[in-house]
């Protein structure tokens, strides 16, 4: 926010420069100009976070209703897992915000996994997937949990074999891809990716405010947005309409053996150690858990962590610096985050073949 000179100083300046009675008019004009500039700044900030009008789909895997229908069936089908009891929707449950509500995911044989299940909303705009960014497309990501030994524990060959044994899948694949031998690993992942790209957050109160409806959010949330984009520094990483930069940062959480993005860097490169992808704040769960491994159980704990600046180490993001926040400011920031929640869209479960 721009600094504004005290009124007496402004009046004295105006009297020297312009003289006499015109001074008051000049000061009034300066105040108006400052207010106009502030409104322009706010409008520019709103534009940065305004939701897009359409959903992107890659040319190599274009959107079709038939492909979405097939991908939806595959997403909810437990036959894609070795046990035959776990589907993608088991962990990415639409009733739980397309996650599972657990501190950490549970994998094959009910073995706890080291990371929390991320929601699958708004992935159409993503550029890197998984907490460590090891997948560069949704098509590549769709294969990973299926073939991971500690997740669904399947091979794509076995997936294809099982699907070919289900008579009802042949017409679904043929309608989606139109080839003589449509049931194949590439088509499985393409359909799953296409369906996931259709999972988009609904319009939230913040969106209506960003479009000009001043009554859509309260004064506390508006102050919270000013904190989010200003003093608190949240928008440095939680940017764009999805409130994520899709990048990777070490935010100073208590470290274990999980190096995150650093796993893919040479040992001599420390910058990416303990760096994980910035999660979206859209439809943020207000009851936790939070962070890539669910180690912070409440929003209050998250705020405390950022206020303290995280654990100091060479890889700590330069954005992580201690700062002070009053109780009112904390409430305002939470009030803003609550405006990012939309009413969950109703989803009809597919009739599996």
Curated annotation (Swiss-Prot):
Chief location bin: periplasm
This protein's record includes keyword Signal: yes
Annotated protein name in UniProt: Methylamine utilization protein MauG
Signal peptide, first to last residue: 1-23
Posttranslational modification: Binds 2 heme c groups covalently per subunit.
A GO BP annotation: methylamine metabolic process
Protein's job: Involved in methylamine metabolism. Essential for the maturation of the beta subunit of MADH, presumably via a step in the biosynthesis of tryptophan tryptophylquinone (TTQ), the cofactor of MADH.
Binding-site residues for heme c 1, renumbered to this chain: 88, 91-92, 292
Residue positions binding heme c 2: 234, 237-238
InterPro entries to which the protein is assigned, alphabetical: Cyt_c-like_dom (IPR009056), Cyt_c-like_dom_sf (IPR036909), Cytochrome_c_Peroxidase/MauG (IPR051395), Di-haem_cyt_c_peroxidsae (IPR004852), MauG/Cytc_peroxidase (IPR026259), Methylamine_utilis_MauG (IPR022394)
GO molecular function: calcium ion binding; cytochrome-c peroxidase activity; electron transfer activity; heme binding
Name of the encoding gene: mauG
Cellular compartments annotated: Periplasm
Cellular component terms (Gene Ontology): periplasmic space
Pathway: One-carbon metabolism; methylamine degradation
EC numbers: 1.-.-.-
Organism of derivation: Methylorubrum extorquens (strain ATCC 14718 / DSM 1338 / JCM 2805 / NCIMB 9133 / AM1)
PANTHER family xrefs: BLL6722 PROTEIN, CYTOCHROME C PEROXIDASE-RELATED
This protein's UniProt keywords: Electron transport, Heme, Iron, Metal-binding, Oxidoreductase, Periplasm, Signal, Transport
């Amino acid at each position: 926010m721009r600094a504004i000179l005290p009124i007496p100083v402004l009046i004295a300046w105006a009297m020297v420069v312009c003289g006499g009675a015109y001074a008051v008019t000049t000061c009034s004009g300066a105040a108006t100009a400052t207010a106009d500039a502030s409104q322009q700044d706010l409008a520019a900030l709103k534009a940065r976070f305004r939701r897009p009008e359409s959903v992107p789909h890659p040319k190599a895997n274009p959107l079709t209703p038939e492909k979405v229908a097939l991908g939806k069936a595959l997403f909810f089908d437990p036959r894609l897992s070795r046990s035959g009891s776990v589907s993608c929707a088991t962990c990415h449950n639409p009733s739980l915000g397309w996650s599972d509500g657990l501190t950490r995911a549970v994998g094959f044989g009910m073995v706890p996994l080291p990371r929390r299940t991320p929601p699958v909303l708004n992935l159409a705009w993503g550029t890197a997937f998984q907490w460590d960014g090891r997948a560069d497309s949704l098509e590549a990501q769709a294969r990973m949990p299926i073939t991971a030994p500690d997740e669904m524990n399947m091979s794509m060959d076995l997936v294809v074999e099982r699907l070919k044994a289900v008579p009802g899948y042949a017409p679904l694949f043929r309608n989606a891809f139109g080839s003589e031998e449509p049931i194949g690993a590439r088509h499985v992942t393409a359909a799953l990716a296409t369906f996931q790209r259709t999972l988009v957050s609904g319009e939230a109160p913040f969106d209506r405010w960003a479009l000009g409806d001043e009554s859509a959010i309260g004064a506390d949330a508006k102050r919270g947005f000013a904190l989010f984009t200003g003093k608190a520094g949240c928008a440095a990483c939680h940017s764009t309409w999805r409130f994520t930069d899709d990048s990777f940062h070490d935010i100073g959480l208590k470290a274990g053996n999980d190096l995150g993005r650093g796993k893919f860097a040479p040992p001599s490169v420390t910058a990416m150690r303990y760096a994980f992808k910035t999660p979206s704040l859209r439809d943020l769960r207000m009851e936790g858990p939070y962070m890539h491994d669910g180690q912070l159980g409440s929003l209050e704990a998250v705020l405390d962590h950022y206020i303290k600046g995280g654990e100091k180490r060479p890889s700590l993001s330069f954005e992580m610096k201690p700062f002070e926040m009053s109780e009112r400011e904390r409430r305002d920031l939470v009030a803003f985050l609550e405006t990012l929640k939309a009413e969950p869209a109703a989803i009809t479960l597919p009739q599996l073949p």
